[in-house]
Amino acid sequence: MSFGGSGSITNRSTLKPLSVDDLRSPSPQKEYRGFRTSVSNIPQEKKFVPSHLSHFGSSQQRRFAPEVSSPLAEPYESSSSFRLSLSSPPSSKFGGPSFGTPKPFLHTNRLGTGSLIEDAPPTQSIYDFSSSRQINALNVGQSSSPFSPVSEKVYDPSFTMSGAPQDSNTSVIVFGFPPELTNQVIAEFSRFGTIISENSLTASSAGFTPSKGPISGNWLQLTYAEPSSAAKAVLSNGMLINDSFMVGCIYSPAEAKEHVPKTLRNSNKDLEMTDASSSETSMSIPVHADAHFQSQSGLGKKVIVQHKNDIFKSSQKHQPRNWLFHYLFGFGSTEPIDEEEKSKTASDNTSLQTSLFGKIVQVVLHTLFGF
């Protein structure tokens, strides 16, 4: 019992406690160092280099081959990684300070021209061309751009109404609304500016001069304090009021007429505005025809009717017979005849008498002598 106990005690004293390093796997650096030391102990034979490969100098082989003494160098590199390592140092390859920066352009090609150049590794990297291409692309883009930057146009209120004088025209004419909406129209147009006066135009106003008085009709003249307010009011031409009446707005012809040349003022194209009462009076004036007007066809002769009841009667065929008996025998129609009609038919009677006398002579000669 004592031997076993003593033996167990001695075994416990010889065991070592476990550490964190014992649980970790060996690092690749340690394995590579052990592999390098084992490889370096193996004797290597000197290889024979052919004469056609003798132009590869020892300096170039050192340049293209990775450093064996580097602890992070790989024993076997792929073709792609080998090509990238040609133009980039180890510091830039493994995240050094020059990582991501373009490399200088390599102009030298020491391999010369020959049949084996195609099999040789590349001497330039893709990063050697990026900087020059970017610079050339920027230069070409700036020089070959045919368009200049577009300048922003500043809004000029003087070009709002090019056809109207913006410096002096402050009066506008509003039309197209019923008289009961006059106050509402004035309230709507007061939003564009301060209204100095509200005048109504009449047909008797000479030169379109507004006459002060009560507002009547469906149009009026508004005078603003500033020309810009009048321009805004003209731009609102066609505004709807109560969704049923379209109101028009134009510049006042009184002020616009001052800027019109004299040759156009007297023309028939000038704007004229009259009331409905004046148009009705002008339409009611009768047209007087000339009493002595008579066309060759007998149309257009003035006819005077003595009695309104006889206006639809035609007694013209009996008139020559009455005048004939009155002229030959001294009696005829007892109806009163105007002096104007007598003077008119006197000339017709002479021509009728000669024609009738000639017909009687022709009838007598034909009866007596047969011709």
From Swiss-Prot:
Write out the entry's keywords from A to Z: Glycoprotein, Membrane, mRNA transport, Nuclear pore complex, Nucleus, Phosphoprotein, Protein transport, Repeat, Translocation, Transport
Which residues does the annotated region (Disordered) include? 1-72
Instruction: Name the InterPro entries on file.
Output: Nucleotide-bd_a/b_plait_sf, RBD_domain_sf, RRM_NUP35_dom
Where in the sequence does UniProt note compositional bias of the Basic and acidic residues kind? Answer: 19-34
| Glycosylated position list | 11, 169, 242, 349
Checking CDD domains in the record gives: RRM_Nup53p_fungi
| Positions of post-translational Phosphoserine modification | 88, 92
One biological process term from GO is:
nuclear pore organization
The compartments listed are: Nucleus, Nuclear pore complex; Nucleus membrane
Please name the Gene3D superfamilies in this protein's record: 3.30.70.330
* Superkingdom of origin: Eukaryota
The name this protein carries in UniProt is Nucleoporin nup40
